[in-house]
């Protein structure tokens, strides 16, 4: 297990990650159709799209055909697909934009600036915001007070807490101040406040998780014609039991057998053996987390401690190779 200082350093890098966005008002809602100036912003990857709605409503106010629309009426789409507002922005980009996982070279070029007129460049990520015609069949409506978003986040935290500890007592026993503070720290990207509260929920380093809170997002076939997401979720223990040993041998030599550390490679091989025939080497596909390819040897528990999103989940996107 890496030291707490190393895990904190990785977590800081994750929270510092930002994504350039170019957001346009839906032409059908604009007084000047597609001539409305876009809204440009570099936004934290761990944040959520609804947090942008108040400023977008104000920015596009003079262009809206319907001036009675509210900020919480807003929703986003990418290439005609409504985006799930309960998923972090960075995850949505990794799912839909189709860019290759970041390397040192690409990261440097992103920092150098971006050309908003280069339609072949995946950055900035080009989104459309709508303030009417809510897609009720695909998205739950938001509310003016932000409680729908808050409740969705806290429920996700509860699920992750239950998987890690076998109980959700941790999140349920948080004070009201800490419970609301956890969500506010993610909204405001305040890592120190987040760490203070999340450390209450995480078992100490010398105490393994019960299971790993991980969701794996699979690519859809090009001809699927469906914008829905395919998600794999199954209990993944942080340690691999020595199941290859016969029961009789196990009983005799239990004291001498130590479980192996579960890596992202071993977890994917177990859950998706056709895509990941090898535990050590990506052959057909590779796991992507926060825009970067994850080493197959990375222990899953360390990934959760250092690289989980604000709700405590590892959201891993599978990208096909070749």
Swiss-Prot record:
Protein family according to the UniProt entry: Belongs to the ATG5 family.
Gene: atg5
Membrane topology: Peripheral membrane protein
InterPro entries per UniProt: Atg5, ATG5_HBR, Atg5_HR, ATG5_UblA, Atg5_UblA_dom_sf, ATG5_UblB
Pfam family, one: ATG5_HBR
Record-level GO cellular component terms: Atg12-Atg5-Atg16 complex; autophagosome; mitochondria-associated endoplasmic reticulum membrane contact site; phagophore; phagophore assembly site membrane
Keywords of the record: Autophagy, Isopeptide bond, Membrane, Protein transport, Transport, Ubl conjugation
Parts forming coiled coils: none
Post-translational modifications reported in the UniProt record: Conjugated to atg12; which is essential for autophagy.
UniProt function note: Involved in cytoplasm to vacuole transport (Cvt) and autophagic vesicle formation. Autophagy is essential for maintenance of amino acid levels and protein synthesis under nitrogen starvation. Required for selective autophagic degradation of the nucleus (nucleophagy). Also required for mitophagy, which eliminates defective or superfluous mitochondria in order to fulfill cellular energy requirements and prevent excess ROS production.
Xref: Gene3D superfamilies: 3.10.20.620, Autophagy protein Apg5, helix rich domain, Phosphatidylinositol 3-kinase Catalytic Subunit, Chain A, domain 1
Species the sequence originates in: Aspergillus oryzae (strain ATCC 42149 / RIB 40)
Origin superkingdom: Eukaryota
Compartments reported by the entry: Preautophagosomal structure membrane
Subunit structure, interactors included: Conjugated with atg12.
Biological process annotations from GO: autophagy of mitochondrion; cellular response to nitrogen starvation; piecemeal microautophagy of the nucleus; protein transport
Recorded GO MF terms: Atg8-family ligase activity
Covalent cross-link Glycyl lysine isopeptide (Lys-Gly) (interchain with G-Cter in atg12) as placed by the record, residue numbers: 158
Name used for this protein in its record: Autophagy protein 5
Chief localization: membrane
Cystine pairs: none
């Amino acid at each position: 297990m890496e030291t707490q200082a190393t895990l904190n350093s990785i977590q800081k890098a994750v929270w510092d990650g930002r994504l350039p966005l170019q957001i346009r008002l839906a032409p059908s809602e604009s007084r000047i159709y597609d001539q409305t100036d876009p809204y440009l912003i570099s936004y934290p990857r761990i944040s959520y799209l609804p947090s942008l709605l108040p400023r977008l409503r104000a920015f596009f106010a003079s262009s809206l055909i319907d001036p009675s629309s509210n900020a919480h009426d807003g929703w986003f789409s990418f290439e005609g697909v409504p985006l799930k507002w309960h998923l972090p922005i960075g995850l949505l980009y990794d799912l839909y934009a189709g860019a290759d996982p970041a390397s040192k070279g690409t990261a440097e070029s992103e920092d150098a600036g971006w050309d908003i007129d280069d339609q072949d460049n995946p950055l900035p990520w080009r989104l459309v915001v709508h303030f009417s015609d809510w897609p009720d069949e695909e998205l739950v409506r938001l509310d003016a007070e932000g409680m729908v978003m808050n409740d969705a986040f806290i429920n996700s935290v509860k699920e992750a807490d239950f998987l890690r500890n076998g109980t959700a007592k941790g999140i349920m026993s948080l004070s009201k101040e800490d419970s609301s503070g956890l969500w506010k720290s993610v909204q405001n990207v305040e890592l120190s406040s987040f760490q203070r509260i999340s450390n209450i929920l995480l078992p100490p380093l010398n105490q393994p998780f019960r299971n790993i809170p991980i969701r794996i997002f699979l690519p859809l076939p090009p001809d699927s014609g469906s914008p829905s997401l395919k998600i794999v979720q199954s209990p993944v223990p942080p340690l691999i039991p020595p199941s290859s040993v016969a029961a009789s041998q196990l009983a005799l030599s239990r004291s001498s057998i130590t479980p192996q550390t579960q890596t992202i490679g071993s977890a994917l091989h177990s859950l998706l053996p056709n895509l990941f025939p090898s535990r050590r080497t990506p052959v057909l596909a590779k796991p992507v987390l926060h825009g970067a390819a994850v080493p197959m040897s990375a222990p899953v528990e360390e990934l959760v401690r250092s690289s989980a999103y604000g709700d405590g989940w590892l959201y891993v996107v599978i990208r096909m190779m070749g």
